[in-house]
């Protein structure tokens, strides 16, 4: 089977989806395909933002989560880290739907923390609307509790 999993991390933090990593390993060991659509690679910006606003908004988000959240040690040589791609909410939806169309999964799942749940649920609703024959499943702390 071909699985697509959504990690709806919208805060550009270094949280690692341990559950998805474990699931990926088990599925791959059993001969299945596993693709991860990781929202950490994107920074959602306002629909009407200009290019300079996009850079400022992205920079503010990175600074907030790299230093103020105190979750992670400040990275030396942070300029070497990948910069999340600034996208509008609609762009992110379109990218997710294109990924589904491209890999043609047999099942789509998502995992995320409570803060990420609205984004993940929204993307999954778009997936279900556009591809109603593909089963969907949710996991992680928020859907479980």
Describe each model-derived feature in a short phrase.
Residues 19, 23-43, 82-145:
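Glycine-rich beta-alpha loop elements in corrinoid/cobalamin-binding modules
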Residues 11-20:
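Glycine- and acidic-residue-enriched helix-capping/strand-helix junction motifs
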Residues 45, 50-69, 73-101:
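Glycine-rich, highly charged phosphate/nucleotide-binding loops
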Residues 1-2, 40, 50:
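N-terminal [4Fe-4S]-dependent radical SAM core
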Residues 5-6, 78-79, 106:
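Generic signal for short, ordered secondary-structure residues
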Residues 1-12:
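Nucleotide-activated donor-dependent transferases that construct or modify glycoconjugates
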Residues 14, 34, 43-49:
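Glycosyltransferase specificity loop/lid
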């Amino acid at each position: 089977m071909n699985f697509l999993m959504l990690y709806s991390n919208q805060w550009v933090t270094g949280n690692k989806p341990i559950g998805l990593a474990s699931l990926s390993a088990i599925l791959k060991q059993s001969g299945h395909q596993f693709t991860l659509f990781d929202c950490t690679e994107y920074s959602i910006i306002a629909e009407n933002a200009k290019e300079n606003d996009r850079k400022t908004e992205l920079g503010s988000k990175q600074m907030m989560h790299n230093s103020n959240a105190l979750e992670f040690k400040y990275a030396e040589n942070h300029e070497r880290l990948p910069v999340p791609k600034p996208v509008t909410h609609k762009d992110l939806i379109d990218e997710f739907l294109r990924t589904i169309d491209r890999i043609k999964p047999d099942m789509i799942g998502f995992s995320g923390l409570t803060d990420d749940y609205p984004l993940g649920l929204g993307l999954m609703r778009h997936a279900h609307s556009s591809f109603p024959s593909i089963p969907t499943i949710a996991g992680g702390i928020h859907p479980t509790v």
